[in-house]
């Protein structure tokens, strides 16, 4: 089968090469079609997303991407946001769990974040009223709320999860977040076997750093989902172990949550675990469940052993050496 590979910026090319090598070692038979996107692509060709990229993704429906840089406060819109809106990948799925061998304050985190991916403040509707006043529109619609809430409950049912928690700020934003919360409760009533509750976003942040094991599935509007995704990654060792899937009706785009890390780009220092875990999510959705499980097991075993690991978790191995170690475990 064909799938699109977008290395992205910074460390993207190095970790994308890890994916290629691991894919070959697993004999997946995937034919990778590589395209450029991001700041480096713009500098080289004048195009943020290389010509042919969108057509290729639409044709095959599957893509795996590395990190892309986004300028702060000015410049072009996030490539991630553009891709999500272009392909209506309405659900961003981010599993978070403790990894043996990674030093953290918690040893029992196992939760999933389901983030609405297409609207909210990320719709990009903002403008200057004058030189001193900027305005941004928080767009929340019932269809999008219903779709993401139903996705969260369906995911919980399919994966044996027991509770879904809605994340909101409806005490202040009574119309927008109020609509999200009301829709959540309506959908929850259709899944009586799954517990449903809700939590205000600021209170949730406190509870996550106090007792994260009390949460199972978190469903959130776009902005809150983005914020708590990084928070939860910090609970389990950082963004080096944070994969995600952007899921639409006909397209799925998998990626690591972390950034492009330009400070270590080209130095063979990047931890490829997150993008390899995202690749495992992709394999699982392709029906290659045994290969996905084998890859996840290899990553977990390598990290738990702690001998050949990257600097972000206390090791001295480079990207290439760590990847070779994973491939060796796949051959066992």
Where are these regions (language model features)?
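Flexible, glycine/charged-enriched surface loops at secondary-structure junctions
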Residues: 31-33, 159-168, 191-199, 288-296, ...
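N-terminal beta-loop-helix "entrance" segment that forms/cooperates
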Residues: 30-52, 208
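N-terminal glycine-rich phosphate/adenylate-binding segment common to multiple enzyme folds
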Residues: 42-135, 223
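Short glycine-rich or small-residue beta-strand-to-loop segments that form or flank ligand, phosphate
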Residues: 2-8, 63-67, 164-170, 278-284
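Glycine-rich phosphate/diphosphate-binding loop of Rossmann-like nucleotide-binding domains
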Residues: 4-26, 130-202, 214
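Buried hydrophobic packing segments
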Residues: 19, 23, 184, 208, ...
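Buried hydrophobic positions in well-ordered alpha/beta secondary-structure cores of metabolic enzymes
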Residues: 9-12, 61, 114, 152, ...
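Glycine-rich phosphate/nucleotide-binding loop
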Residues: 39-43, 207-307
């Amino acid at each position: 089968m064909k799938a699109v590979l977008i290395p992205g910026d910074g460390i993207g090319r190095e970790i994308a090469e890890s994916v290629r090598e691991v894919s070959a070692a697993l004999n997946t038979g995937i034919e990778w079609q590589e395209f450029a996107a991001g700041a480096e692509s713009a500098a080289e060709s004048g195009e943020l997303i290389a010509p042919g990229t969108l057509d290729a993704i639409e044709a095959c429906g599957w893509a795996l991407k590395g990190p892309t840089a986004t300028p702060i406060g000015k410049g072009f819109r996030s490539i991630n946001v553009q891709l999500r809106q272009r392909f209506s990948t309405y659900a961003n799925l981010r599993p978070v769990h403790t990894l043996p061998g990674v030093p953290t304050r918690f040893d029992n985190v196992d939760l999933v974040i389901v983030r609405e991916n297409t609207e909210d403040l990320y719709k990009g509707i903002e403008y200057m009223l004058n030189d001193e006043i900027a305005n941004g529109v928080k767009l929340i619609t019932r269809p999008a709320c219903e779709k993401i809430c139903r996705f969260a409950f369906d995911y919980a049912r399919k994966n044996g999860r027991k509770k879904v928690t809605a994340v909101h700020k409806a005490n202040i934003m009574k119309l927008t977040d109020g609509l999200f919360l009301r829709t959540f409760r309506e959908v929850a009533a259709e899944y009586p076997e799954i517990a449903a509750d809700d939590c205000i976003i600021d209170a949730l942040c406190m509870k996550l750093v106090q007792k994260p094991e009390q949460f199972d599935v978190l469903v959130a509007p776009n902005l809150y989902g983005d914020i708590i995704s990084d928070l939860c990654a910090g609970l389990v060792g950082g963004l080096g172990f944070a994969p995600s899937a952007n899921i639409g009706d006909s397209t799925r785009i998998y990626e690591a949550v972390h950034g492009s890390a330009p400070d270590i780009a080209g130095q063979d220092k990047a931890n490829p675990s997150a993008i390899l875990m995202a690749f495992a999510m992709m394999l699982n959705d392709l029906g290659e469940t045994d290969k996905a499980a084998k890859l996840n097991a290899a990553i977990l075993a390598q990290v738990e052993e702690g001998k050949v690991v990257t600097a972000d978790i206390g090791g001295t191995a480079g990207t290439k050496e760590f990847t070779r170690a994973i491939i060796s475990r796949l051959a066992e």
